[in-house]
């Protein structure tokens, strides 16, 4: 009978697949993590042994902030590469959705390392906006306000704008337009308004119903025209600067992303033709992680694309649509929390 080897364990658990460059098994058969670019391996068995010597017993949560840093750098470098390849003339803004992990050490680490990449934050409620305002982001970093909005949430966002924060309030329901107009008039602020568009395209995987036409949030085509008319009537035509779409989380199939991007690019073009100088497109979340290492669209825990492929599609789609219609390239925002 063949003796079981460490390589057999690596193959059985597909560690080389899902571990990417971060996790692996060393020659002792122990799991290790390589959180930094210097390739220093940290033996997790040694870490646990040391914790027990300090009277810390399992279960414990080990956090590797360097992996967060590396993911930010990876996404930024992918956009830089795509911009060079497709002659993209806009800017890319990485925005972290604070709902993913609101723990102070995590948010502070992301903001601290993300400063050189102009990383911003996304909030989906008034309490989250309070937390975001308290974080010391760069002055030109973007804050995106999504989710259910009442008068107090909107007024807080506009007050933060008066303080110098770069805030976009995204309209997701028709009634929010009146609230924004009233608050803007009361506070004497010209708001930066975004509109969430409910695309016909949807994502794939476990959370596909959180986006696309089945989504609870966003405006359909007919509602979009009504919203634009209302904004014009309230004197806010020039305040409409962003369109936002979200087709779901952990999207497993790159083809679904490509379809949604083409649909969103068409909205971008048509809005420019209607005289709206949209200069930001928020592609929402959905960038998936290959948790099981199979690189397959048939598993809800995997994806059939890389970060670079995702970014290439985002950049190329809007560059192509913009160039064909002789309009400026939009600045692209991504809200990936994974």
Where are these regions (language model features)?
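Active-site-proximal beta-alpha core segment in soluble small-molecule metabolic enzymes
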Residues: 87-278, 282, 289, 306
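N-terminal leader/propeptide and maturation segments of large enzyme subunits in energy/redox metabolism
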Residues: 54-56, 287-288, 295-297
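Active-site loop ensemble at the mouth of alpha/beta enzyme cores that anchors a bound cofactor
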Residues: 208-211, 297-309, 315, 338
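N-terminal basic/disordered segments at the start of proteins
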Residues: 1-40
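Flexible, glycine/charged-enriched surface loops at secondary-structure junctions
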Residues: 58, 62, 84-89, 274-280, ...
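Low-complexity, highly charged intrinsically disordered N-terminal segments
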Residues: 25-102
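Phosphate/diphosphate-binding loops
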Residues: 10, 166-182, 221, 304-322, ...
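N-terminal and secondary-structure boundary signal
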Residues: 254, 297, 321-328, 333-338
């Amino acid at each position: 009978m063949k003796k079981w080897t460490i390589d057999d364990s690596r193959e059985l658990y597909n560690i080389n697949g899902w571990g990417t460059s971060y996790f692996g098994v060393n020659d002792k058969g122990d799991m290790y993590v390589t959180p930094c670019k210097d390739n220093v391996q940290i033996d997790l068995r040694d870490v646990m042994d040391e914790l027990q010597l300090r009277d810390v017993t399992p279960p414990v949560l080990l956090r590797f902030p360097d992996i967060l840093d590396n993911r930010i750098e990876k996404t930024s470098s992918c956009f830089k590469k795509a911009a060079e390849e497709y002659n993209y003339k806009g800017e890319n803004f990485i925005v972290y959705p604070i709902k993913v992990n609101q723990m102070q050490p995590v948010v502070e680490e992301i903001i601290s390392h993300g400063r050189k990449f102009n990383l911003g934050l996304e909030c989906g409620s008034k309490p989250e906006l309070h937390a975001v305002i308290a974080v010391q982001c760069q002055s030109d970093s973007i804050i995106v306000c999504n989710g259910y909005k009442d008068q107090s949430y909107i007024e807080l966002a506009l007050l933060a704008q008066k303080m110098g924060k770069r805030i976009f309030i995204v309209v997701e329901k028709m009634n929010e337009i009146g609230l924004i107009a009233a608050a803007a008039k009361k506070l004497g602020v010209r708001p930066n308004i975004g509109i969430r568009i409910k695309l016909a395209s949807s994502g794939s995987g476990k959370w596909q119903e959180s986006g696309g036409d089945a989504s609870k949030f966003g405006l359909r085509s007919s509602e979009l025209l009504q919203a634009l008319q209302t904004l014009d009537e309230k004197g806010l035509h020039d305040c409409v600067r962003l369109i936002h779409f979200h087709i779901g989380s952990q999207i497993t199939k790159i083809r679904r992303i490509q379809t949604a991007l083409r649909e969103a690019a068409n909205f971008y073009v048509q809005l420019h033709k209607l005289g709206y100088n949209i200069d930001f497109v928020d592609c929402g979340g959905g960038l998936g992680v290959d948790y099981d290492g199979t690189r397959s669209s048939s598993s809800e825990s995997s994806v059939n694309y890389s970060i670079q492929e995702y970014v290439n599609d985002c950049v190329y789609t809007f560059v192509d649509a913009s160039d064909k219609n002789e309009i400026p390239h939009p600045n692209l925002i991504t809200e990936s929390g994974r």
